[in-house]
C-alpha cells in the first residue's frame, strides 16, 4: 500500500516499478545467450555489465541511498572483481563459443540486473518491507516472463510442457530468489549497488567452491583458478570498502 501511495503522490515514478521486468529480461536473455557463448563467458560478460552500471547507479543515487563519486579506487575495485571472475572461470572457457554479439547481449543483460537492484532499493525505501518489495518484483517479473513464454509458444515450435522435463528441484530457484531480492533491496540502500555486487560475487564463488567440495559431480576437481578468483574478489571488496571509508 505504501508503494502505491508513493506512486500516487508522485514521489515514486511509475516506471520504477518495472524492476521485476528487468530481472525477467535477464533470465530470458540468459536462456538465449548461454547456449551460444557458454556459461563462463556469459557470467563474465554479465558481471562486467553489472559492475559498470553499479558505478553509475551509485553515482546518481538511484537506490535511494547516499550518492557515491566514481573514484579511481571504485573503478579499480570493479576491474579487480571482473578479473577475479575471469580467472575463476579460466579453465571453463571454450574459445570456439566466443561471439561478439552474444557477449554484447550478456553485458547489456548484466547492466539490467544492476539497475534492477537499485530500483528495488528505492522501492524498498517507500515500502519499508523487503518482502513486499520482493513480492512486487516477482509479480511483475513473472507476468512479463509469462507473456514472453506465450509469445514463444505461439510463434515457435517450443511447447510450455517442456518445462516439466527437468528435475523438480530446479523450480526451487525462484523461491530462493524471493529471499535474495528481499535482502538485496535492503542492503543496497546501505552499502550501495557496487559493493553489494562485489560481495555477492564473492558469495557465489564461495558457494561454487562448497558445492565442488561437498556435492561434487562426476569429474569435478577443485580448481586453483576458482580459489585465486575468490581471493581477488575480496581484494576488490576491500578496495571499494576503503574508498567508501575515505569519503567519510
What residue spans do the PLM features occupy?
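Membrane-interface interhelical linkers
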Residues: 1-18, 59-79, 93-98, 122-135, ...
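Glycine-/small-residue-enriched transmembrane alpha-helix faces in small-molecule transporters
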Residues: 25, 29, 73-79, 83, ...
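Small-residue-rich segments of transmembrane alpha-helices in multi-pass membrane proteins
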Residues: 17-28, 73-88, 106, 134-144, ...
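Membrane-interface helix-loop-helix junctions at boundaries between adjacent transmembrane segments
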Residues: 32-50, 55-76
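Helix-helix packing/entry segments at the starts of transmembrane helices
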Residues: 40-49, 126, 130-140, 178-212
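C-terminal-most transmembrane helix of multi-pass membrane proteins
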Residues: 85-92, 201-248
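Structural signature of hydrophobic alpha-helical transmembrane segments
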Residues: 34-52, 97-112, 161-177, 224-231
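Specific transmembrane alpha-helical segments of multi-pass solute transporters/efflux pumps
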Residues: 2-41, 46, 86-87, 175-191
Amino acid at each position: 500500500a505504501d508503494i502505491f501511495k508513493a506512486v500516487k503522490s508522485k514521489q515514486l515514478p511509475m516506471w520504477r516499478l518495472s524492476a521485476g521486468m528487468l530481472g525477467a529480461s535477464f533470465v530470458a536473455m540468459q536462456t538465449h545467450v548461454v547456449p551460444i557463448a557458454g556459461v563462463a563467458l556469459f557470467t563474465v560478460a554479465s558481471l562486467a555489465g553489472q559492475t559498470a552500471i553499479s558505478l553509475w547507479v551509485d553515482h546518481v543515487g538511484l537506490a535511494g541511498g547516499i550518492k557515491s563519486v566514481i573514484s579511481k579506487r571504485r573503478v579499480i575495485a570493479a576491474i579487480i572483481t571482473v578479473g577475479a571472475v575471469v580467472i575463476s572461470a579460466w579453465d571453463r572457457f571454450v574459445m570456439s563459443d566466443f561471439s561478439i554479439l552474444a557477449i554484447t547481449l550478456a553485458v547489456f543483460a548484466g547492466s539490467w540486473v544492476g539497475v534492477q537492484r537499485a530500483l528495488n532499493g528505492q522501492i524498498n525505501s517507500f515500502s519499508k518491507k523487503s518482502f513486499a518489495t520482493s513480492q512486487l518484483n516477482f509479480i511483475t517479473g513473472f507476468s512479463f516472463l509469462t507473456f514472453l513464454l506465450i509469445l514463444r509458444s505461439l510463434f515457435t515450435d517450443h511447447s510450455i510442457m517442456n518445462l516439466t522435463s527437468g528435475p523438480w528441484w530446479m523450480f526451487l530457484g525462484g523461491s530462493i530468489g524471493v529471499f535474495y531480492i528481499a535482502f538485496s533491496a535492503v542492503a543496497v540502500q546501505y552499502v550501495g549497488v557496487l559493493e553489494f555486487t562485489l560481495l555477492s560475487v564473492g558469495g557465489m564463488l564461495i558457494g561454487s567452491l562448497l558445492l565442488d567440495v561437498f556435492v561434487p559431480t562426476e569429474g569435478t576437481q577443485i580448481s586453483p583458478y576458482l580459489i585465486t578468483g575468490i581471493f581477488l574478489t575480496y581484494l576488490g571488496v576491500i578496495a571499494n570498502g576503503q574508498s567508501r571509508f575515505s569519503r567519510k
